[in-house]
Structures are given as structure tokens and as C-alpha cells.
């Protein structure tokens, strides 16, 4: 399986240690584990993730402490009302969890104080994007940017000088000829055996940005690279389909009251049908009818198809709320059950726009080699867009998803989608 992301991630360690503290708390107050506690632990892990408590990459703000305290208070009070603890026991557990998480995060941030030193060698169209990201990242420091174009030997000497002075932890190679020098390769290999990391810019861009540099990819790159198991891993595909059916049925039953209320409000707010049915292009370029709650006026496309924009006056008042919370997408659970869509995948587009985008964007057609989704990596990583440039940016994430797909990645995307819904970060 391909590597996803290279930024330090302490989520797993943080989760394991939080569970340990919870269990120690149970022992201190002489309580057994019990089924209820298992459920509370599992739910708390999910809630911490959704609330972004596990994110250790940014600066530690007062908001983070408030979120930790609030979540722990709610969780402990729930266990209190479930009669798992007495009040004084709940207070002990709350204190243990809160103090541990705050102290742990400070320890992690201190550990991140020693930044990884990165050297960029050469430059191309993606260098500036990566430079901006590195400058904002608390884990990394740009210790060199070597962009000598005329003489590769000068560039090589500068690079080796940085390595000898221990100013390099990571080399990112944007050139096409740096490794032609066999003597340089031998020396870099020795540094690598002592802990230095070397990446060509395509590898680094994918790992660091969690997307693919589409415009610099060639058919040869697709042929040689690992990943893309979504095309041939039958176990993952079957598991994905089974989970789609289970989730669609369970969620569908749970959201029936929400859908009924939404349908009534839509009908009361504006004239026209409750549902919006439109042809989209799915896997294998096969058209299918997508079903959504109508969020626009009935004459929204009287002048022809066009993308929705920010503050689009065609969107109804309740439609804005539905788009923020993704309620308008709920009827697509029917498309999932029918096998036309999956929970996770590239969002399906209309043929009218696809024809335009395939002319303008390289590899755009690859989106249609997999089943479209209710949500996707592009949707949780990039804001709603309404231009060819936005479509290109989203394709970078879509192809990254296709290359790195597995069930765990799907779960991560679904959890991020929950965050978007809860905090109203939709369109």
C-alpha cells in the first residue's frame, strides 16, 4: 500500500495513551471495564478525531484546551448518567483525562521544536506551492534552496557542503539530472544510511500534500508506480460494496425523520418538486440518474447549465442550509443501494461539464474509472469550486484517492465528512 502523508502524526499514540489513562482511571476508582465503558472509549476516540484533537501539527491554542475540556466533560457526564460512575468518581476521571491530554500535547509540541531541515534542489511549477506549505509547517525548516541552472557541478558542490555541515535531513530533487553523477550518488547514499532522506519532487509532493502533481505526470509514471489497488484488489472492492450497503441501510433508517422534515420545508418554501433528479456520468462513463433534495429554484438553469457559485442567488434559503450540512445529498443513499455510487469516491459530474474539462485537464477521464461517491477526498480537502482551475485542483485529490484507496482511507474520509457536516463547512 502506498504511503499517505509524511507529516508526523501522533493520532495513534495519542489514542492508545488516552485509552490507557481511561483504564487506569477505572482501576483507581475500582470499576471493572464493562460493555458501557468499551462503548464510551470507542465513541470518545471518534469524537476526538472529528473535533481535530489529534492534530499535533499546528500551534497549540486556547481553543484546543477548551475543546478537550468540553469533550471530556460531556463524555464523563454521559457515563455518570449511565450510572457507570458516582459523581466524585466521574470528577476524578475527568481530571485524569483532561490533564493527560493537555500535558501530552505540550510534550509533543516541545518535541517538534527541533524542525526537520529540508533542502530543495532545482525548481519547477510545483516548487512555489511546496515552499509556501513548508514555511507554514511547524515541523520543517527550509535550510537551502539550490537552483543553479547553468552548471550542475556548482549545484552539486553546494548540496554536498550542506550535507557535510549537517544542515540537511531531507533532500527534495526537482531536477532531472542530479543523480547522473555517480560520485554524488555514492556520497548521498552514505548520508541516507545515516538518516538523511531523499525524494524526487513527485514522491515528496504526493506524500506531503496528499495529492498528485497531475500536470507533471506521464503515462510511464502511472505504469511504474505502486498503488491503484482499487482496480484489481477484489477483496477491497467487495468489502467496500458490503460496507456501502450496510451503511446506506443503517443511515437511511436513522435519517428518515430528517428527510421528512426537509421535504416538508422544501415544499413550503418554494414551488416545485421536492427531489432534484439529474443525469450524471458514473463508472465506465455510464450515465445514471442522481437523486438530491432540490436546493435551487425550479428555473435555476433556464439559461443553460452552469456551476453553482458562492452566494448563488438561485439557491433557496433552506437550500443554503442543506448544502452546508449536506442534507441535500441524503437521497443519494438510494443511488448507493443501487450500486451506481459508493459512499466514498470522486463526485459525479454532468456530461456537459465533463466534455469541457476533459479538453482542458489532463487525465480528467480517470475519474470515471472508479465508482463515484457521496463524498470524496477532494470534497474534504478542497472548498467548493466553480471553475476549471478548481476542477484541476480537485482532480489532484481524486487521483490521489484512486492511487491510495483502501478501506481505512475510506473511513478517514467519512470521519472528515462528519466534521464538515457538524461544523457546517459545506458549500
Task: Indicate residue ranges for each PLM-predicted region.
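Signature of alpha-helical transmembrane segments in polytopic membrane proteins
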Residues: 1-111
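N-terminal hydrophobic signal-anchor/signal peptide
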Residues: 2-18, 105-253
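Aromatic-capped interface at the extracytoplasmic side
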Residues: 102-115, 265-275
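Acidic, Ser/Thr-rich low-complexity segments on the non-lumenal side of membrane proteins
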Residues: 125-152, 291-313, 317-319
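Short, glycine-rich, amphipathic interfacial segments at transmembrane boundaries or analogous
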Residues: 205, 212-213, 276-314, 375-394, ...
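A hydrophobic, helix-centered structural microdomain
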Residues: 235-299, 335, 407, 412-427
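A short, structured surface patch at a secondary-structure boundary
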Residues: 309-371, 413-417, 421
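C-terminal terminal-structure detector
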Residues: 338, 361-427
